[in-house]
Every structure is written in C-alpha cells, then in structure tokens.
Amino acid sequence: MAIGVIGRKCGMTRVFTEEGVSVPVTVIEVGPNRVSQVKTEESDGYQAVQVTVGERRASRVTKAQAGHFAKAGVEAGRGVWEFRAEAGEFEAGSSVTVEGFEAGQMIDVTGTSKGKGFAGGVKRWNFSTQDATHGNSLSHRAPGSIGQNQTPGRVFKGKKMAGHLGAERVTVQNLEVVRVDADKNLLLVKGAVPGATGGDVIVRLAVKAKA
C-alpha cells in the first residue's frame, strides 16, 4: 500500500463505464518516487520517508544536494517531499510507484491552485455587491466597512480584503481512483484536482475516507 506519491497533473479527459456513463477524470503522471532518505525517531525526532521524483540538470544541483542524493544512491530530482511512515517500511534507494493504488480507493490530492493575480473582494471572497443605483455612485464593488469603532481602533488580522487570489496550497479530499495504468505510470482520478496542467501534486490516501 502506498503512503502517498508525487505526481504531475497532465490535464483532464473522460472515461466511460460499462453502462455508458461519462466520468470526468484528471490524469496524473506518477513517475517512480525514489526514496532519498528515511527519517527515524533516533536521528530526526520523527519517522518519515523523503522522496524525490523527476530529474534535474547536474548544473542545477548543489554540492550538498548531490551528496545527499548520492548517499541514498538515487538520481537528483526536481524537488524533495516527505510522507510520514512507520519505521522499516521503506529503505533509501527504493521506489514508490503508482502500483500502490488501486481502482475504487479514495484519495486526497494537494496542489498549488492557479494564480489569478490581484482580485477584489467580490471575486476573491464572494462578497455581495452594493446597490447599482439609488444614490450609489462609486461603491458598487467596494468591500464596505473594515472595522468597528474607537474600540478596538484597528483592523483585525486576517480581515478579508482585496489581494492576491490563488497560487496557494489547496487540498481536495475524497476523490475516487477510477483507473491505475502501471505500464504508463498514470493515475486517473474522478473530478478535478488543484493547479495548472504540468504542476506537481501530492496524492495521499484519504484521511476522511467513508467506511
């Protein structure tokens, strides 16, 4: 059973069931996740497995990174990620593949949402607009009041206002694995997953899977 894998979003398509029902799916390419380090309670204070995936030009790998990957006997990848794992479950140099998943499993997918630049409160937070007429001249899409009075005399941290929309870590839970193609290293997931085509996504077993 896979603890999780790092994949790359390829885009969306659809597959048909035997009854002819169209199912929208996201295609995730999951190359072999190479184990670059196994963290233990004794040396690191917690148990986890560190993986890398893909490749990176030698000129883009620092000496520290090169030594780290060489110690595990794996090729340098485009990044490193961690998954919590029990001791002895994995060893450095081994691989985690898409074969750890099977059709019908429920998974959680984490990615970086598409960046949409600077956005106002209506678009970013789904604020209601103000009156289009009846004396309203310039405040149709304005947020309105952002504070109270002399007390507290300030704007609270985290106040929903205009700002950068998207480009943040998002997790979609309880997506169904429709198909696993071990030959092509593909995972077909029902529905949409966060991020743009070509972006890295983290696929884990669902933490809130319904029994």
From Swiss-Prot:
Methylated by PrmB. GO terms for cellular component: cytosolic large ribosomal subunit. One of its GO terms (biological process) is translation. Residues 130-139 have a biased composition (Polar residues). One of its GO terms (molecular function) is rRNA binding. NCBIfam families: L3_bact (TIGR03625). One of the primary rRNA binding proteins, it binds directly near the 3'-end of the 23S rRNA, where it nucleates assembly of the 50S subunit. Part of the 50S ribosomal subunit. Forms a cluster with proteins L14 and L19. Belongs to the universal ribosomal protein uL3 family. This is Large ribosomal subunit protein uL3. The gene is rplC.
